[in-house]
């Protein structure tokens, strides 16, 4: 199983990014793996406007943009997005 689809690895990533307390709520929202969390919002890391991320992820978790855990969620989302993109790239190269 790849890191993208591992629930255990997602939990570890939550811990590493300081948002382990949000893990149960992330799972309830259906975001139990990096692959699922990567597509929880239309936001693409690096774009100036992170409004979609704030609205679709942060606010849905009952947090506001100024919550200290928001930066951890951003890092987790970035990791999820880059892991999923790398996995897709790998699959395309082997097909």
Describe the predicted segments one by one.
Residues 20, 32, 43-47:
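Short amphipathic alpha-helical interaction elements and helix-loop-helix interfaces
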